[in-house]
Regions:
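ABC-type nucleotide-binding domain
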Residues: 5, 10-13, 19-281
């Protein structure tokens, strides 16, 4: 929410139209973005297929988070264009753009409101039954009934405290995941979604994230490579350019940047991978 709720200086064009997403194809075409006269993203070309799950990998400062901020149209490009289903994001309303993109981040900032209000933040007109269904999918139904606040409210009516301070890190992430399940946007961004959690909690939440990724176009950023190694394709950024791309196995064989990062994190050991579950046709 911190990213989606930030102050935006870019204004809609006078004739901006609502974004219509029927497939979820994302294209970065000759994209260049500069900060302090330095190209952070440098002539980048990337096409993400409808329903494809990709992981963005790279050393600190490679441009991973900048790429996400550009997709959300927080900044103006120096060059190029970003298309969603063939529609330039500069030509659509920002509200419609962000309605079609859901975000789970490392720093889950919740409102100082009730659990229910936080879950319905992305879709305020949702029914309680729809909210309960999202909570079950996020596996948050176990702890919510036990929550209480100083006003004497409990469960879904309990206030979570400023930035969700009354909840554990795992509980905050489950509320955030329930919110995204309820929003049901066709494009999903996971930005270090589990990096702040311990291994046991991370493993439990990863199952919910796998369910969340079904039938969506997904872009995931993670420093912990084992959490994204099962993606359809991994994109390795280096100084704002695509240095490598392929599956985990292909990149290990290339023995390049990705293989070096993997070796450093795992000591060469392969970790068990859990493919993203696909819905049966």
């Amino acid at each position: 929410m911190k990213t989606l709720g930030r102050s935006i200086t870019i204004q809609d064009k006078p004739n901006a139209k609502d974004l219509e997403v029927k497939q979820g194809v994302i294209e970065f075409k000759d994209v260049t973005f500069a900060y302090n006269s330095k190209n952070v993203i440098d002539n980048l070309n990337l096409r993400i297929r409808a329903g494809e799950k990709i992981g963005i990998v790279g050393r600190s400062g490679a441009g991973k988070s900048t790429l996400i901020q550009l997709l959300l149209h927080f900044y103006q490009l120096k060059q190029g264009e970003i298309l969603i289903d063939g529609q330039n994001i500069e030509d659509v309303t920002q509200d419609s753009l962000r309605r079609n993109i859901a975000l789970v981040t490392q720093d889950t900032s919740l409102l100082h409101r009730s659990v229910a209000e936080n879950i319905k933040y992305g879709r305020p007109n949702a029914s309680d039954e729809e909210m309960y269904a999202a909570v079950r999918k996020a596996k948050a139904e176990e702890f919510i009934p036990q929550l209480t606040d100083l006003r004497g409210k409990s469960g879904y009516e309990a206030y979570v405290g400023e930035r969700g301070v009354k909840l554990s890190g795992g509980q905050r992430q489950r509320i955030a995941i329930a919110r995204v399940f309820l929003k049901d946007a066709p494009i999903l961004i996971l930005d270090e979604a589990t990096s702040a959690l311990d291994s046991e909690v991370e493993a439990a939440i990863q199952s919910s994230l796998d369910d969340l990724m079904q039938d969506k176009t997904v872009i995931a950023i993670a420093h912990r490579l084992s959490t994204i190694a099962q993606m359809d394709r991994l994109i390795v950024l280096d100084e704002g350019r695509i240095a490598e791309q392929g599956t985990h196995e292909e990149l290990i064989q290339k023995n390049g940047i990705y293989a070096h990062l993997w070796q450093r994190q795992t000591g060469g050991f392969l970790t068990e991978q859990h493919p993203i579950k696909k819905k049966e046709a």
